[in-house]
Amino acid sequence: MDRTFAEGALPSSQDGDRARRARILCCITFHFVRRRLESLADVLQALAEFPVAFLEVVLVTNSIDESDASTLRRLALEIMGEGRATVCRVEGLDNPFDLAWQHKPIIAERFLGPTDSGFTHFLYLEDDIRFSFQNFEYFIAAREQLRDAGLLPAFVRTEWSEVAGGLVATDCFW
């Protein structure tokens, strides 16, 4: 894979140390569709490999029956291990696309709440957004470079398009 980084943007050992000390709260939205469990498993596996001080995953899903919730809990337990993931079912969504916003109360209560949560970073992912520890290290390094300018690093989401015959930017609609 060919990548271009700004001078000094490659993560340093100091950035790696900072990344390994992280205590991460991660929400993954997953509108329950059984055929998408494999994609969710891939996202969870990438997170399970993070060599960080602490990582907790909250699977935010639509209103599902207990059997489907049990499937999600078993998948999370198998990949993440005991006590590292929970399932949060959201009831009464007017539109299925509203699920993408249901992590906001979790940020308010668990990350920014009135008591010190101990978390240093929050990640929002969806069941088809694989985020590696290398991505996290890049963010840590780029964040420091951009801090004085008041900017934050970003990622461009891409996915494979059969129609285009290649990768396309997921969030570009022109």
Spans of features found by a protein language model:
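Active-site-proximal specificity loops/subdomain of glycosyltransferases
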Residues: E66-T120
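Acidic ATP/Mg2+-coordinating residue in the GHKL
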Residues: T61-I64, D127
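Conserved catalytic core of nucleotide-sugar-dependent glycosyltransferases
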Residues: S132-W174
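Short, charged/polar "capping" segments at the starts of alpha-helices
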Residues: R35-L37, I64-L72, V163
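A conserved hydrophobic helix/loop-capping motif in glycosyltransferases and polysaccharide synthases
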Residues: L25-R36
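A short, charged/proline- and glycine-enriched loop
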Residues: D15-C26
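Short beta-strand-to-loop acidic/aromatic patch adjacent to the donor-nucleotide binding site
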Residues: G118-R130
